[in-house]
Design a protein with these regions (language model features):
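Active-site cofactor/cluster-binding pocket
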Residues: 1-221, 225
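Thiamine diphosphate
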Residues: 3-83, 232-329, 338-359
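Short, solvent-exposed amphipathic alpha-helical segments in soluble enzyme
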Residues: 23-26, 87-89, 107-111, 133, ...
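Short gly/pro/ser/thr-enriched loop/turn and capping motifs at secondary-structure boundaries
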Residues: 42-45, 99-102, 124, 235, ...
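A short helix->loop->beta-strand "cap" motif at the edges of active sites that frequently abuts
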Residues: 86-92, 97, 112-114, 250, ...
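Conserved thiamine diphosphate
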Residues: 118-119, 141, 318-365, 391-404, ...
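Flexible, low-complexity linker and terminal segments
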Residues: 207-215, 219, 351, 356, ...
C-alpha cells in the first residue's frame, strides 16, 4: 500500500504556520518522498487565519487531497475551522493543556475517533524557551518526535534561514525544537499509526515553488528584460527572476505602475529581446490597451497573470480562476492573443518556456494564467535538461544587416500565407519601421483604406488560424483504457490547477468502474474547438469544473463549439478538492459497481 500522508499547520498569521509547513515539506523531500503543498493566508501582515498543508507520498501526487491525517492547531480558530474535517483516525495536536486559547471538546473527539495530543506550544515557547515567537519550532519538535520526521533536516533549515541573524538566534530555535521533543517524550503515549518512512534513494529532483518555476522558465527561455509593478500574488516572480536574469546580462525594472511595465516590455521586445511582465487581475485590467498595442504592432510579449479573487481588490491572497475573460477577450477591438494555463508547478516551468516560444513564433502577446494557490504550491519536480530545452527554443525570424536582402523587398508587415513576416529591430536590421497602434500597410505606414484594413486584419488573424493543429502538445488527453470510438460514461474538461485536482478524481472513479474521457487543455485561447468536440462526442455528458462563479471556460465551450457542458464551480477562495469533482460525476452518471 502506498504511503500517503497530509500534515496541516493552522493558526494565526504571524505565528509561523507557513514556515512550519515549509520546513516539513523539505524534510519529506529529504526522505525521497513526493510532495505537494497548499498554503493560504490573509492579506493582513499579522493576524487572520493562515494554514500550510503538506501532502507527501512515495507515489506521484496530483492534488492537495481531500483533507488531512494530522492537524496542528495553533489556536482556537484553527480548531473551529478544521473541526468538520476531523474524521475517524485523524490526529489533533493542540496548544494545551495550558497556555493556549482553547480546549477541544474531548467527548466529541472521542466519539469521532479523533486522537488528540496536548502540546503546550505557547507556554513552552514563552516560559521554557523564553521567546513566544518560537511557538512554531516547538510544534516542529513535537512533530519530529511523534511522526518520525528527521530532526536533523529541521536543524539544517534553521541554520540556513537564521544563521545571518547570529548563532544566538539559531540556538534559540534549537532550544524550541528540543522543548517540543522533550514534552512529547515525557508526556505523550503515541496512539496513532502515522510515521514517516525511512529515507529512500534520492531522486534527481529540484524543489520549486510555483512562482519560482515561472522565473526559472523565463530565464531558460532567454528572457532578457523583466518589468513589473509589485502586486500580490505575483511579486515573487520578479524577486526570483532578478537573481537569475541579472546573471545572464538581463535587466529587471520595477515600474511605477502596471501600464508602464507593459510599455517597457513592448519597447524591449521591439528592440529585439525577449521580455516579460507578471501581475494579477487588477494589473491585467490596466494593461489591456497596451496588450492591444502588442497585438496590432505584432510584437512578442509574455504576460503572466497570477490570478486572485476579484473583482477590484477582492481577495489578494486567495485562489481563483476568474481572469479568463479578461485575458482572452478583455481588450477593445479584434486583437490576436494567446492564452495558456499550467496545471502544476512543473508545468509552470515548461509552459513559461512555451509562452516565449509561442510569442516569438506568432508575434503576439501571450498571457500565462496561473493562480494564487499554484504560485505558492511547492513540488519536487524532475530536474530539467536545460541544454535540451534551450536547443529547441524558438526565436523570431529577424532580418539583420549582414543578410543579402533588397531593401525595397523588406516589408515588416508583409502579407504572407501564414500571416507571419520576418521582424526588424533597431540597430540590427538594415531598415527602420514604425511599430504603431494605428492600422497600417505592409510597410508599417498608417493606412485607413478599406481594402488595406481588410487585408491586414485577415493577415493578423491568419497567424493563429491553425494554432490548435500546430500545438497538439498543449492539449493533454487522458482516455484511460478507452480507445477512439469507445463510449464513455462522461467526458470531463478541466484547465489550470483544477485539471490536476480533476486527474485525481478521475483516477478514483476509474477504479470504481467508471469510463471517463478527460481533456486537459493548456491552450485556452484560441479555444481548441476540435479537441473539445472530439472528447465530448465520446459521451452524452460533458462536465467542466472551474474555480469561478460564471463558468468562464464552459461558456467559451458553448461559444466556440456545439457542446453544451454541465458546469461545476467553486468560488470560495480555495481550490476544489478531488472528492467534490468525484461526487459530481457520480451524481451525473449514477452509481457504478466496480467489475
Amino acid at each position: 500500500m502506498a504511503f500517503d500522508l497530509t500534515i496541516k499547520f493552522a493558526g494565526e498569521g504571524g505565528e509561523g504556520v507557513i514556515s512550519a509547513g515549509d520546513f516539513t515539506m523539505r524534510a519529506a523531500t529529504y526522505l525521497g518522498l513526493e510532495v505537494v503543498t497548499f498554503k493560504s493566508f490573509p492579506a493582513e501582515i499579522k493576524g487572520g487565519y493562515a494554514l500550510s498543508q503538506v501532502r507527501m507520498s512515495d507515489e506521484k501526487i496530483l492534488s492537495q487531497g481531500d483533507g488531512f491525517q494530522i492537524l496542528f492547531a495553533f489556536n482556537g480558530e484553527a480548531y473551529e475551522v478544521n473541526k468538520p474535517l476531523l474524521k475517524p483516525g485523524t490526529v489533533l495536536v493542540w496548544d494545551g493543556p495550558e497556555g493556549g486559547d482553547f480546549e477541544p471538546e474531548f467527548d466529541w473527539l472521542e466519539k469521532q475517533g479523533v486522537i488528540a495530543y496536548a502540546v503546550p506550544m505557547s507556554k513552552l515557547a514563552k516560559e521554557e524557551v523564553g521567546a513566544s515567537i518560537t511557538k512554531n519550532m516547538v510544534a516542529l519538535g513535537a512533530a519530529s518526535e511523534l511522526f518520525n520526521i528527521p530532526i536533523d533536516v529541521y536543524k539544517e533549515q534553521i541554520v540556513s534561514k537564521f544563521s545571518k541573524k547570529g548563532q544566538d538566534v539559531v540556538d534559540l530555535n534549537f532550544k524550541a525544537l528540543d522543548a517540543g521533543i522533550n514534552w512529547v517524550k515525557n508526556n505523550i503515549k503515541k496512539a496513532d499509526p502515522y510515521r514517516l518512512p525511512e529515507r529512500m534513494p534520492r531522486k534527481d529532483v529540484i524543489i520549486l515553488e510555483g512562482n519560482e518555476a515561472i522565473a526559472l522558465g523565463a530565464a531558460v527561455a532567454g528572457c532578457k528584460v523583466y518589468a513589473a509593478y509589485p502586486i500580490t500574488p505575483a511579486t515573487t516572480v520578479g524577486n526570483y527572476l532578478s537573481e537569475l536574469i541579472l546573471k545572464a546580462n538581463g535587466y529587471v525594472y520595477q515600474a511605477e505602475d502596471e501600464i508602464s511595465s507593459m510599455a517597457i516590455v513592448i519597447g524591449a521586445s521591439f528592440s529585439g529581446v525577449k521580455a516579460m511582465t507578471a501581475t494579477s487581475g487588477p494589473g491585467i485590467s490596466l494593461m489591456q490597451e497596451l496588450i492591444g498595442l502588442a497585438s496590432m504592432a505584432e510584437i512578442p510579449a509574455v504576460i503572466v497573470d497570477v490570478q486572485r479573487g476579484g473583482p477590484s481588490t477582492g481577495m489578494p491572497t486567495k485562489h481563483d480562476q476568474a481572469d479568463l475573460y479578461a485575458a482572452a477577450i478583455g481588450g477593445h477591438g479584434d486583437g490576436q492573443r494567446i492564452v495558456i494555463a499550467p496545471t502544476n508547478v512543473e508545468e509552470n516551468f515548461y509552459l513559461t518556456v512555451e509562452a516565449f516560444n509561442l510569442a516569438e513564433k506568432y508575434q503576439c502577446p501571450v498571457l500565462f494564467l496561473t493562480d494564487a494557490s499554484l504560485s505558492l504550491r511547492v513540488e519536487a519536480i524532475p530536474t530539467p535538461n536545460i541544454k535540451e530545452i534551450q536547443s529547441k527554443l524558438i526565436n523570431r525570424p529577424l532580418i539583420t544587416k549582414d543578410m543579402n536582402v533588397d531593401l525595397n523587398e523588406i516589408l515588416r508587415y508583409k502579407v504572407t500565407e501564414t500571416g507571419i513576416a520576418p521582424m526588424l529591430a533597431p540597430g540590427v536590421s538594415p531598415k527602420p519601421y514604425a511599430a504603431t497602434g494605428l492600422e497600417h500597410g505592409e510597410d508599417s505606414s498608417p493606412r485607413t483604406r478599406p481594402d488595406i484594413r481588410v487585408k491586414m486584419m485577415e493577415k493578423r488573424f491568419r497567424k493563429l488560424q491553425n494554432i490548435e493543429d500546430e500545438n497538439q502538445h498543449l492539449i493533454e488527453w487522458d482516455l484511460g483504457d478507452l480507445q477512439e470510438g469507445d463510449k464513455a460514461d462522461i467526458s470531463v474538461i478541466a484547465w489550470g490547477l483544477t485539471a490536476s485536482i480533476t486527474k485525481e478524481a478521475v483516477q478514483r472513479l476509474r477504479k470504481k468502474g467508471y469510463k471517463v474521457a478527460a481533456l486537459y487543455p493548456k491552450l485556452l485561447y484560441p479555444v481548441p474547438a476540435k479537441a473539445i468536440e472530439k472528447v465530448a462526442s465520446m459521451s452524452d455528458i460533458t462536465l467542466v469544473p472551474e474555480a469561478n462563479y460564471t463558468g468562464q471556460f464552459a461558456r467559451f465551450v458553448r461559444m466556440y463549439t456545439s457542446v453544451r457542458p454541465v458546469q461545476l464551480n467553486v468560488y470560495r477562495g480555495e481550490p476544489f478538492i478531488p472528492a467534490e469533482i468525484e461526487a459530481k460525476i457520480e451524481e451525473l452518471v449514477g452509481s457504478k459497481v466496480n467489475a
